Amino acid sequence: MLNKQTLISIEDALPGREQPMQIEDCHFVNQSSLTAPLAHHQQQILLGMGCFWGAERLFWQLDGVVSTSVGYAGGFTPNPTYEEVCTGKTGHTEVVRVVFDERVISLAQLLAVFWEKHDPTQGMRQGNDLGTQYRSAIYTYSQDQQEIADKSKLQYQQALEAELRSTITTEIVPAGPYYFAETYHQQYLAKNPDGYCGIGGTGVCFPPSLQG
């Protein structure tokens, strides 16, 4: 019997499919392209912080964020469906892909929001959402991003320890494939303002002097 709090092995993961998910390319909120190549002053990062509906809304509201989308990453099954991810048999976590203008907002500033707005100490869950798909994760696209993310984790761990909180369980590794979620998930809380939002932090602030 599958334990949804234990990551599945690649041997036991669902096979998936070759055909990518077909999505509407236009961002529902700011009309940006979800699939456009990065400009020279832009970066991307994948952030997992529980249910991706509420997480995405946090980031599209920030100055300097060019575009956001939601999808699946960190697992084994190619081009999974939401229903497959929910079984725990793909290895993926729900993530937000954030494309940002590094001239306006830094990765360190984005990560301060990431750390503060969810509980990164809960392992394979986030609040009432239970399963490996809700694990906390940062998937990076360069060595510089990896170093910034690792450093910010240490800084936030120190802030948590000062408040006698638990140990961070966030997975921080180089990004593998990113698979778009279905169109109805994209900018979900803009389309459904009264929809479910599971976002909730620890109440511990990231030290302002360290946000870069």
Curated annotation (Swiss-Prot):
A Pfam family matched in the record: PMSR
Catalyzed chemical reaction(s):
L-methionyl-[protein] + [thioredoxin]-disulfide + H2O = L-methionyl-(S)-S-oxide-[protein] + [thioredoxin]-dithiol; [thioredoxin]-disulfide + L-methionine + H2O = L-methionine (S)-S-oxide + [thioredoxin]-dithiol
What GO biological process terms are annotated to this protein in UniProt?
A: cellular response to oxidative stress; protein modification process
EC number(s) of the enzyme? Answer: 1.8.4.11
Q: Which top EC class applies here?
A: oxidoreductase
Q: Which residues cross the membrane?
A: none
Q: What SUPFAM superfamilies would the database entry show?
A: Peptide methionine sulfoxide reductase
The UniProt entry annotates the active site at: 51
- GO molecular function terms listed in the Swiss-Prot or TrEMBL record: L-methionine-(S)-S-oxide reductase activity; peptide-methionine (S)-S-oxide reductase activity
Q: Name one GO cellular component term.
A: cytoplasm
* Keywords from the named record: Oxidoreductase
Domain of life from the UniProt record: Bacteria
| Listed PANTHER family | MITOCHONDRIAL PEPTIDE METHIONINE SULFOXIDE REDUCTASE (PTHR42799:SF2)
Read off the HAMAP family from this record.
MsrA
Task: Give the family per the record.
Answer: Belongs to the MsrA Met sulfoxide reductase family.
Q: What does this protein do?
A: Has an important function as a repair enzyme for proteins that have been inactivated by oxidation. Catalyzes the reversible oxidation-reduction of methionine sulfoxide in proteins to methionine.
Q: What is this protein called?
A: Peptide methionine sulfoxide reductase MsrA
**Species whose genome carries this gene:** Vibrio parahaemolyticus serotype O3:K6 (strain RIMD 2210633)
